[in-house]
């Protein structure tokens, strides 16, 4: 009766085994990383006390549900003017060729946290004390990194640590500049000293206690030599560090490469609290279907849940513009697809609606314990995704109304390889709906969803 279902279980078990063995190379991100990132609420201007406040909230309210990473996003080396909400402040040059604003940097061309924003870094301590604080809460610490080497280090001809006489100007690719933040040059990885520079910054981050780095301006366009350089530097730094690549969209043609060298990578450009952008994520998800697994995860981007844009970078300060139904769809789809879950809102300002979204253990289990998610069908008004479940014959199913009106979304159990009776459980309500045979149907609001667990009786 269940031949097709048995084949599906066997295939997912085989895929899980080989993905798990592959992931042991760095033993990080064996399940999709779960955490918080400062960008969506603080842009380039987060301060140390705000990072600590979010860490405190996570440790008290979220850690027991699996949330663990606290990530400081970009421009931590830049002294933002008070009240500034400028997202990407460009550097300009003085008559002698030097750069303004000048970023905090050590003698080896390695950026350091700005002490005005991160007072514990004063005296060259870097992020060590902040990381220690976050680790003391039982959490992990991450930072954002722009690809390459600071242009000001190239101008200053900063020596590259670990080399004999090689300076920053000898390893930079001065034709490679990020179009939306001009602080860095790319690295020419064929030049002697380029890998040593990456080795030096990763050893610095490891000495601080960094557990996660998000490298930006590296996945679009896809820069395989530099990606391999960061990977090698992590392998040699003496600490387990997860590697995240940004921005999207990462080319699907490079899926084999990115699976080998990164732990997560962006499928799309920046995602914000807009239904049209959420619809596009459904298309990206189909493109990357079947690629994710232990140690390597396609990433939808940070989650638009909670208080956003307190200091930029997009739109006025606000709670997420998503409706309650859209928030359920947002959270449910990130979970069933097994995308990394990085919260973007300011956690201490969460209301009940936000806390209920991110503390449902049965919903989070779909993200952490699912296997081989795949799209069952999609049309103009409905979409259904299914995931098997590690250690069980049960299945997870997401029913999504992507149309403009409330309507019934149908699940044909035969398409799951099931011909007998099933028990359907509503994961958001944490309650069994009933026993069904052949099909299950639910009336769902426009832009809403149902997240289910299907148990074969």
Regions found by a protein language model. Give the residues of each.
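Bacterial Sec-dependent N-terminal signal peptides
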Residues: 1-24
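Structural recognition of the beta-strand scaffold that forms the well-ordered cores
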Residues: 32-38, 68-73, 140-145, 206, ...
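Aromatic-lined carbohydrate-binding/catalytic grooves of carbohydrate-active enzymes
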Residues: 59-133, 137-206, 210-212, 217, ...
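Glycan-recognition surfaces
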Residues: 170-176, 189-190, 196, 240-346
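Carbohydrate-binding surface patches
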Residues: 328, 334-337, 342-344, 378-418
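Catalytic cores of secreted or luminal carbohydrate-active enzymes
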Residues: 329-377
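Solvent-exposed beta-hairpin/edge-strand motifs
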Residues: 414-429
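C-terminal beta-strand-rich structural cap/linker in extracellular carbohydrate-active enzymes
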Residues: 435-457
């Amino acid at each position: 009766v269940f031949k097709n279902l048995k084949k599906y279980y066997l295939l997912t078990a085989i895929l899980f085994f080989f993905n798990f063995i592959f992931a042991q190379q760095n033993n990080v991100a064996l399940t999709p990383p779960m955490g918080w990132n400062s960008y969506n609420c603080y842009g380039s201007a987060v301060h140390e006390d705000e990072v600590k406040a979010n860490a405190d909230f996570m440790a008290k309210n979220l850690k027991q549900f699996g949330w663990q990473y606290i990530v400081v996003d970009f421009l931590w080396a830049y002294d933002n003017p008070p009240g500034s909400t400028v997202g990407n402040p460009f550097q300009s040059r003085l008559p002698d060729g030097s750069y303004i604003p000048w970023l905090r940097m050590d003698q080896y061309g390695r950026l350091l946290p700005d002490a005005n924003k991160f007072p514990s870094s004063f005296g060259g301590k870097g992020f060590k004390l902040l990381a220690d604080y976050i680790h003391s809460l039982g959490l992990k610490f991450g930072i954002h990194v722009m690809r390459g080497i600071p242009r000001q280090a190239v101008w200053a001809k900063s020596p590259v640590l670990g080399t004999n006489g090689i300076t920053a100007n000898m390893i930079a690719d001065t034709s490679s500049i990020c179009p939306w933040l001009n602080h860095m040059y790319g690295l020419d990885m064929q030049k002697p000293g380029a890998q040593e520079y990456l080795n030096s910054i990763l050893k610095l981050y490891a000495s601080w206690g960094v557990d996660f780095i998000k490298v930006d301006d590296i996945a679009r366009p896809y820069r395989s030599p530099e990606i391999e350089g960061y990977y090698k530097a992590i392998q040699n730094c003496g600490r387990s560090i997860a590697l995240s690549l940004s921005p999207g969209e990462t080319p699907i043609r490079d899926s084999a490469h990115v699976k080998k060298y990164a732990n997560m990578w962006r499928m799309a450009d920046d995602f914000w609290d807009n239904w049209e952008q959420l619809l596009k994520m459904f298309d990206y998800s189909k493109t990357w279907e079947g690629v994710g697994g232990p140690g390597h995860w396609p990433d939808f981007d940070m989650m638009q849940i909670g208080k956003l844009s307190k200091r930029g970078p997009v739109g006025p300060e606000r709670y997420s513009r998503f409706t309650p139904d859209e928030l359920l769809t947002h959270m449910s789809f990130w979970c069933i697809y097994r995308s990394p879950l990085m919260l973007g809102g300011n956690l201490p300002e969460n209301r009940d609606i936000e806390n209920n979204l991110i503390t449902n253990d049965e919903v989070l289990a779909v993200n952490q314990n699912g296997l081989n998610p795949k799209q069952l069908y999609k049309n103009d008004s409905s979409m259904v995704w299914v995931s098997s479940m590690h250690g069980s014959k049960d299945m997870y199913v997401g029913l999504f109304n992507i149309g403009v009106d409330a309507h019934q979304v149908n699940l044909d159990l035969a398409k799951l390889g099931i011909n007998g009776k099933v028990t359907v459980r509503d994961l958001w309500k944490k309650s069994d709906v009933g026993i069904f045979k052949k099909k299950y149907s639910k009336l769902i609001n426009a832009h809403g969803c149902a997240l289910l667990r299907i148990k074969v009786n």
